[in-house]
Design a protein with these regions (language model features):
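N-terminal Sec signal peptide cleavage junction
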Residues: 1-5
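Intrinsically disordered, low-complexity regions of eukaryotic proteins
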Residues: 6-9, 88
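Tryptophan-anchored aromatic micro-motifs
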Residues: 10-38, 168-169
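Short, solvent-exposed coil/turn segments at beta-strand boundaries
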Residues: 21, 39-48, 149-159
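Contiguous, well-ordered beta-strand patches that form the walls/edges
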Residues: 28-35, 52-156
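Beta-strand residues in well-ordered beta-sheet regions across diverse protein folds
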Residues: 50, 162-163
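Short, low-complexity, Pro/Ser/Thr/Gly-rich segments in the mature regions of secreted, periplasmic
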Residues: 164-172
Length: 172
């Protein structure tokens, strides 16, 4: 009785493609405090998330108080994964290139300086400040060049990011 070799085939999991999610995606004014609007731009291996933050009484998102910019680079889509919402998507790794805050009016700037926001008291209106590695009230922010892991799914009209559990709409 001889041993027969069994033919085996290895099937690799599908891998995501950056070209599928390239472009501009946005999330309109949130319905809960803090009121925010977000825009995601994905081009090449770069992913930029810009958040405009509004006042507690500005539910229409009329006048932004400050902006937060997170720029990730070296985007690498990975294999297919099950996301927290039980849909299928893909893993995504990147490195943090920029994490900054910009106060957009004098009142916000004064408040940030009085409260030593992110440990800083030299905020200036419309001037961007790096806040990577600093504590801005929710624990220490990631440091520059730190690896970031997320998962995503998409349709032709929307992009879902698993880490934030937010869905962004495709912009023309």
């Amino acid at each position: 009785m001889g041993l027969e070799e069994e033919e085996s085939t290895v099937t690799s999991a599908p891998t995501g493609s950056l070209s599928d999610i390239e472009g501009t995606w946005s999330l309109g004014c949130t319905s809960e405090k803090p009121y925010e609007q977000e825009t995601v731009q994905i081009h090449g291996v770069d992913f930029v998330l810009e958040t405009l933050v509004y006042g507690d009484s500005d539910s229409a998102c009329s006048v932004a108080r400050y902006s937060v910019k997170k720029h990730y680079t070296n985007l690498v889509p990975g294999t297919e994964r099950t996301l927290s919402n039980e849909t299928m998507g893909y893993s995504l790794t990147s490195a943090l290139k920029e994490f900054s805050v910009t106060p957009l009016n004098d009142n916000t700037t004064n408040t940030m300086n009085l409260n030593n926001y992110c440990g800083e008291s030299s905020w200036q209106t419309n001037q961007t400040m790096n806040v990577a590695g600093k504590d801005c009230g929710n624990g220490a922010n990631p440091i520059l060049n730190s690896k970031v892991y997320d998962r995503y799914s998409f349709t032709t009209e929307s992009l879902y990011l698993d880490g934030s559990q937010k869905t962004y709409q495709k912009q023309p």
